[in-house]
Amino acid sequence: MISLCGIITAQEVEKDTVKKVSLDSLAATVNDHSMKLAGYEEKFSGLEAIVNELNKIKVSGYIQAQYEMYDTWSSDGTIHGVPVSGTTSYEDNSFYIRRARIKFTYKPIDGVNFVLQPNYEVHQVTLKDAYVQLNDRWLNTFSLWVGQFNRPTYEIEYSSASREFAERTLMTRTLYPTERDQGVKLEADFATKYNFPLKLQVAVLNGNFGEGSLASQAKDVDNAKDLMARGVYSVKMLSNSLGIDFGAHTYLGKTTVIAQTTPPTVFSDVNNNPFIPKVGDRLNKELFGGELQAYYDFLGGLSLKGEYIRGTYSGTTNAAQVNSLFNANKIRNVEGYYISFVKNIGKVNTASIRYDVFDPNTKMSGNAITNAGDLRYNNWTYAWQYFFNDNIKLMACYVMPINEKSQNAGEDFKIDKHDNIFTLRVQARF
């Protein structure tokens, strides 16, 4: 009996010892895991901070690769194609990277955006957008833009990635070269806070971007600033199936004569009369325009868009200021407009047609014109888009420029110069 009790007591002691050892081991294991978890938590906290910062950065962009056919002939029919830059040869077709852009948008805090968008070309990288946008967090109405950004007109602000045609109109490309400028812009959008569909934009700009060499565009060349303003009002009708935006804009600037030659360069005024400006003279560059866009949700959706611009424009051949599409020492009354019609065909196709006109000299016409740069152009553009998915689309576009005829502006322009262009484009965006 005593022996049996001793055995039982020994077993109980052994069990208690095992329990104690097991508990101590378990506690050590738990502590070890707790320390490891604390380390992981610290690492994850660091990763979370990095992820949170990365979430503030949005990266987007697009590539437009295309094949072009230049149905261009000289007046005597001996030359087919367009000049190849830097050579004496001509080409009538080419593969071409039209645009390759990547856009970085950083939002460090609510109401603040930093935007940087370079454009990559085969021979150079250029800066398209670089600005800081400060949004009003109190009234949710105002925003301030500082840097390099789009000039405020409809056709310019409508992205090249979304546009239904291969290129913007001749009017816009001439009057607002490269679309951007450097300066400061204030916007007021009364729709968000006050449910009033009015948007106002006012910008103070250097006024020389897109003119002269890239080095000349980095800063203002004449110290004077240009003013640009735009207003757009939106209405919806027919149970919101019809939307109409209409507005107006103005550009108030000057072309300053920053140098003269010996003998002095002779300019031409709006009446085609010669004059010799002095260094420091400021030549008018004042434009006034109207716009209208109508969207109707009918049979898949259709839209009708148009803009009209009229005013006085000036240019110079000075290398620091020259506008390649207005390359002359002159002041001119100019006028231009376009009308475009876009129709969705099913869910993945869009057909578009555009008629645009640009007259770089409204006071002269026909045989009175002695310089091809004063000829009026009426252009027809036809385009078809196929949307492969949300990121890839195909475009076929055909442009038919029709120039005003003059017997005194060069052999090529005694008749309509044959200079049509066909473009087949693939666009990928992300």
Residue ranges with predicted function:
Residues 218-222, 285:
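Interfacial loop-to-helix transition and helix-capping segments at the boundaries
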Residues 8-64, 73:
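N-terminal periplasmic/intermembrane-space "pro-region" immediately following the signal or transit peptide
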Residues 197-198, 211-217, 258-261:
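A short secondary-structure junction signal
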Residues 1-6:
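Bacterial N-terminal signal peptides
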Residues 203-218, 268-275:
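Active-site-proximal beta-alpha loop/turn segments in soluble metabolic enzymes
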Residues 50-74, 84-210, 221-241, 250-252, ...:
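Outer membrane beta-barrel
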Residues 27, 88-89, 131-134, 148, ...:
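Outer-membrane beta-barrel pore domains
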Residues 117, 214-219, 411-414:
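Short, solvent-exposed loop/turn segments at secondary-structure boundaries
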